[in-house]
């Protein structure tokens, strides 16, 4: 007798996955989507297969706000091996250069100063950035190097954790668009010995709590033993994806107009400007709007369940 077909459903929220090593972000996202039987899913910035750690998975209506998490600050713990450069700048690549390591901790501390604050970074060829519609990594795999422009990034914190030659461990708090592999490769060049990433763990995205993260095998066990309603309790509310934005609570009439996508006048006693989170009179999350003086302009709205 054939098994009943899985029924996909509308389910909204953010699942905090502790990504395992060895899987692509897209593969693990698809697995989470299947376990929740969700109609729609999206991740919020890929982690390399080598990397582990926090990967927020947006389900349903939360996918409308995934860009906010893609743009959010991130934190990483990274271990680099000095003395070797690879073509991918991590341990999955081929070693392309080997040099002796004559580096002491004081040299490392001095070198780190160059990478704090606002800097320019040339993205690695082994990245998903596109050139003429094709990801850079596809060119790299064909042995083709494409000219890349340096991009502005911000390293808010770059903390020395430990150094046991040839392995160096650092903690990084950075802006969107930062490639940790490139950061390590550049640091290795400043130190004069080369370096590549051997361990990378994302420890934070925006303000999401580390304690809420769950491993995929834990989710699989729960899915085998409990109904979907129990799995849904693991989801964080959709509005957590935009928690950095100020909140604006509307009255009944304003909520109704916003629901139809209409602009709304309001007193703006809080003197708000820019993007805000909108909540109805019943404290339901409505979406994101742009405040222009005393006008609320809807930008991205939740589709409310009937």
From Swiss-Prot:
Catalytic function, reaction form: uridine(55) in tRNA = pseudouridine(55) in tRNA
Native source species: Haemophilus influenzae (strain PittGG)
Name of the molecule in the record: tRNA pseudouridine synthase B
Keywords: Isomerase, tRNA processing
Family the entry assigns: Belongs to the pseudouridine synthase TruB family. Type 1 subfamily.
UniProt EC number: 5.4.99.25
Molecular function (Gene Ontology), one example: tRNA pseudouridine(55) synthase activity
Enzyme class: isomerase
Gene Ontology biological process: mRNA pseudouridine synthesis; tRNA pseudouridine synthesis
Function in brief: Responsible for synthesis of pseudouridine from uracil-55 in the psi GC loop of transfer RNAs.
Alphabetized InterPro entries for the sequence: PsdUridine_synth_cat_dom_sf, PsdUridine_synth_N, PUA-like_sf, PUA_sf, tRNA_psdUridine_synth_TruB, tRNA_sdUridine_synth_fam1_C, TruB_C
Name of the encoding gene: truB
Active-site residues from the entry: 48 (nucleophile)
Keyword Isomerase found: yes
């Amino acid at each position: 007798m054939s098994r009943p077909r899985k029924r996909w459903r509308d389910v909204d929220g953010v699942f905090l996955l502790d990504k395992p090593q060895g899987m692509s972000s897209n593969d693990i996202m698809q697995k989470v989507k299947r376990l929740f039987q969700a109609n729609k899913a999206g991740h919020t910035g890929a982690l390399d297969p080598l990397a582990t750690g926090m990967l927020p998975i947006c389900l349903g209506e939360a996918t409308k706000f995934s860009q906010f998490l893609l743009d959010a600050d991130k934190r990483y713990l990274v271990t680099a091996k000095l003395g070797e450069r690879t073509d991918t700048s991590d341990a999955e690549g081929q070693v392309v250069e080997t040099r002796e390591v004559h580096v002491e901790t004081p040299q490392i501390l001095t070198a780190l100063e160059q990478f704090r604050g606002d800097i320019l970074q040339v993205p690695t060829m082994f990245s998903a950035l596109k050139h003429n519609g094709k990801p850079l990594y596809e060119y790299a795999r064909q042995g083709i190097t494409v000219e890349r422009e340096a991009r502005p990034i911000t390293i808010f914190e770059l903390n020395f954790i430990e150094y046991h030659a040839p392995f160096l461990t650092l903690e990084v708090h950075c802006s969107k668009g930062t490639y940790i592999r490139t950061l390590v490769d550049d640091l290795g060049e400043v130190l004069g010995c080369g370096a590549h990433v051997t361990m990378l763990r994302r420890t934070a995205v925006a303000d999401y709590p580390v304690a809420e993260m769950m491993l995929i095998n834990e989710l699989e066990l729960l899915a085998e033993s409990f109904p979907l309603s129990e799995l849904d309790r693991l989801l964080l509310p959709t509005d957590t994806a935009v928690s950095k934005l100020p909140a604006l609570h509307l009255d009944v009439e304003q909520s109704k107009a916003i629901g139809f996508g209409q602009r709304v006048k309001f007193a703006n006693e809080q003197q708000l400007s820019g993007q805000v989170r909108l909540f109805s009179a019943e404290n339901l999350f409505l979406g994101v709007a742009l405040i222009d003086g005393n006008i609320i302009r809807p930008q991205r709205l939740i589709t409310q369940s009937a």
